[in-house]
């Protein structure tokens, strides 16, 4: 809790712990979801288990290898690139803060508590953000959103009524649980009513009505 107040004091420029509590109340009153503008939500990401996401280091290496030029460019590329820039910078600042706090704490138990809190709580949020934006840039936002919905449906379906393997993002069109409209065979097969041919008299009357 002392570390949390310290973070709030630094970020809010508040000189006292009481002021940090005021900052905390202000933050709790705001309904900020970093995925809303991209069509997703924190709840949708929460269906994926924590061990699904790679480590922050692996995700940062992937972002650097694939999109370093775009991330370092002064030009605006996409909202996902902008979000990735902010996530990378925030993670760097968080690591600097954690290092500073860990260095200035004399108690080893407190230092271990700081490292554990950052890795367990804040680390997961950063892993989710990095994975989401990298995946959207790699596979496309629509496919990633479809995957999240498909995985959510799969994980909430009882094991006896769902496929044994979870959906895989790279092969989603073949294994997805929730399919888009127009992809099923039934929609491609015309109904018996459509196959019936209309008589010339009926077609003639319909053409006259359309002219009117």
UniProtKB/Swiss-Prot annotation:
Keyword Signal among UniProt keywords: yes
Quaternary structure and partners: Homodimerizes.
Provenance organism: Hepatitis B virus genotype D subtype ayw (isolate Australia/AustKW/1991) (HBV-D)
Function as written in the Swiss-Prot or TrEMBL entry: May regulate immune response to the intracellular capsid in acting as a T-cell tolerogen, by having an immunoregulatory effect which prevents destruction of infected cells by cytotoxic T-cells. This immune regulation may predispose to chronicity during perinatal infections and prevent severe liver injury during adult infections.
Molecular function GO labels: DNA binding; RNA binding; structural molecule activity
UniProt keyword annotations, A-Z: Disulfide bond, Host nucleus, Host-virus interaction, Repeat, Secreted, Signal, Viral immunoevasion
Compositionally biased residues, Basic residues: 180-205
Stretches for region 3 X 8 AA repeats of S-P-R-R-R-R-S-Q: 184-206
Biological process, per Gene Ontology: microtubule-dependent intracellular transport of viral material towards nucleus; symbiont entry into host cell; viral penetration into host nucleus
Record propeptide residues: 184-212
Family: Belongs to the orthohepadnavirus precore antigen family.
Positions of the UniProt region annotated as HBEAG: 25-27
Subcellular compartments: Secreted; Host nucleus
A Pfam match: Hep_core_N
Post-translation changes: Phosphorylated.
Signal peptide: 1-19
Sequence repeat residue numbers: 184-190, 191-198, 199-206
Entry's Gene Ontology cellular component terms: extracellular region; host cell; host cell cytoplasm; host cell nucleus; T=4 icosahedral viral capsid
Region listing for Disordered, in residue ranges: 179-212
UniProt-recorded name of the protein: External core antigen
């Amino acid at each position: 809790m002392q570390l949390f107040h310290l973070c709030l004091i630094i970020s809010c420029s508040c000189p006292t712990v009481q002021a940090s509590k005021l900052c905390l109340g202000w933050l709790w009153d705001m309904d900020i979801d970093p995925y809303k503008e991209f069509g997703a939500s924190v709840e949708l990401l929460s269906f994926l288990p924590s061990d699904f996401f790679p480590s922050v280091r692996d995700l940062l290496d992937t972002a650097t290898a694939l999109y370093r030029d775009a991330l370092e460019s002064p030009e605006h590329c996409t909202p996902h690139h902008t979000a990735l820039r902010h996530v990378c910078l925030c993670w760097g600042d968080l690591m600097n803060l954690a290092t500073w706090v860990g260095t200035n704490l004399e108690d080893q138990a407190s230092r271990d508590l700081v490292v554990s809190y950052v890795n367990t709580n804040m680390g997961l949020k950063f892993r989710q953000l990095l994975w989401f934006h990298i995946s959207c840039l790699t596979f496309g936002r629509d496919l990633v959103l479809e995957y999240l919905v498909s995985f959510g449906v799969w994980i909430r379906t009882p094991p006896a009524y769902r496929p044994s393997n979870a959906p895989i993002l790279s092969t989603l069109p073949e294994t997805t649980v929730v399919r888009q409209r127009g992809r099923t065979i039934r929609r491609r097969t015309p109904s018996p009513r459509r196959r019936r041919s209309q008589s010339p008299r009926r077609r003639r009357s319909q053409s006259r009505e359309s002219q009117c």
